[in-house]
Amino acid sequence: PFPQYGCAVHGAAFTAPEETADRVLSGFTAPDDGLVHIGLLHGELTGSDSRYRPLTTAAVAASGLHYLALGHVHGCTGVLRIGSVPYAYCGCPEGRGFDELGDKGFLAGQVSPEGAELQFVPFARRRYRIMEVDVTDGDPAALVSAALPAGAEEDIYRVVLTGSPAAPVSPER
């Protein structure tokens, strides 16, 4: 607890390659002590088996938390609700590969007993993007250059060439 800040943070480490049971929220209820109670967990909301600390909607709803910050999903869900408990996967601050496209960042705002008012704040220095370029009847290098948007050097691109070029493509160009 951090009474000087009016809150308590409840969490647990992910200490093994797999956590196949919810040993954190199952049976947990935040005390009614006047503090704002925030849960901070790496876990997966699922009704089925998971290797990544499966969390049930029933356990979340019964937790009495004022907000549950979840990690595992690398895309931001925005603030959602299970029962009276607001929760979100905030995503990750930087994409790590082409399976994590688009804006990455964090959630910032206020959590109170009445709810969570949080906004997504873009943070990533670079975004991963996939772009298709039809190279039929043209110079592939010129077509790719023309297709790249202004500021493309700020991001990381996978360029997928489609179609049939008029001449063989040389990797040196």
Regions found by a protein language model. Give the residues of each.
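His/Asp/Glu-rich metal-coordinating catalytic cores
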Residues: 1-88, 92-105, 110
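Accessory, non-catalytic peripheral segments of nucleic-acid enzymes
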Residues: 113-173
